[in-house]
Amino acid sequence: MNPAHLLVLLAVCVSLLGAANIPPQPLNLLQFKNMIQCAGSRLWVAYVKYGCYCGPGGTGTPLDQLDRCCQTHDHCYDNAKKFGNCIPYFKTYEYTCNKPDITCTDAKGSCGRTVCDCDRAAAICFAAAPYNLANFGIDKEKHCQ
């Protein structure tokens, strides 16, 4: 075999080994983002660091109605995990959007339908809740005990 071909093959193998250590990204977050846009007018990034429960993790008492939407969504995902093999952050699902109406179309009782229903309820809740800019990017250690 040509030495140049061996070098290319080696480079491909090394890059594949490196890629094997990259954790998979949550797949349904793109769907959830699109669902949020379907239900309301705020960009999804407005919710990433909002209050005590919006974004990763969550603790303490929700600061307002919007933060309660995120807490409820977290609890809904916790319930979805009881399906055994249901991992909400990685479970994709089918739905339709006819602004502002969202319809989940996976089979009732399935993991996908349950996760879709969680995301749908949260998106509708987000759209209905007032947004308090003072609750964005707060110090969670100070305000969320």
From Swiss-Prot:
Propeptide: 20-27
Transmembrane domains' residue ranges: none
Keywords linked to the UniProt accession: Calcium, Disulfide bond, Hydrolase, Lipid degradation, Lipid metabolism, Metal-binding, Neurotoxin, Presynaptic neurotoxin, Secreted, Signal, Toxin
Protein name (Swiss-Prot/TrEMBL): Basic phospholipase A2 Vb-2
GO MF annotations in UniProt: calcium ion binding; calcium-dependent phospholipase A2 activity; phospholipid binding; signaling receptor binding; toxin activity
InterPro entries: PLipase_A2, PLipase_A2_Asp_AS, PLipase_A2_dom, PLipase_A2_dom_sf, PLipase_A2_His_AS
CDD domains xrefs: PLA2c
Pfam families reported in the protein's UniProt record: Phospholip_A2_1
Compartment list: Secreted
Cofactor requirement: Ca(2+)
Family classification: Belongs to the phospholipase A2 family. Group I subfamily. D49 sub-subfamily.
GO biological process annotation, one example: phospholipid metabolic process
Signal peptide: 1-19
EC number, as in UniProt: 3.1.1.4
Protein purpose: Snake venom phospholipase A2 (PLA2) that has only a weak enzymatic activity. Inhibits neuromuscular transmission by blocking acetylcholine release from the nerve termini. PLA2 catalyzes the calcium-dependent hydrolysis of the 2-acyl groups in 3-sn-phosphoglycerides.
Residue numbers binding Ca(2+): Y53, G55, G57, D74
Tissues/organs with expression: Expressed by the venom gland.
Cofactor comment: Binds 1 Ca(2+) ion.
Cysteine disulfide partners in this protein: C38-C97, C52-C144, C54-C70, C69-C125, C76-C118, C86-C111, C104-C116
Gene Ontology CC terms: extracellular region
Catalytic activity: a 1,2-diacyl-sn-glycero-3-phosphocholine + H2O = a 1-acyl-sn-glycero-3-phosphocholine + a fatty acid + H(+)
Gene3D superfamilies given in the database record: Phospholipase A2 domain
Catalytic-site annotation from UniProt: H73, D119
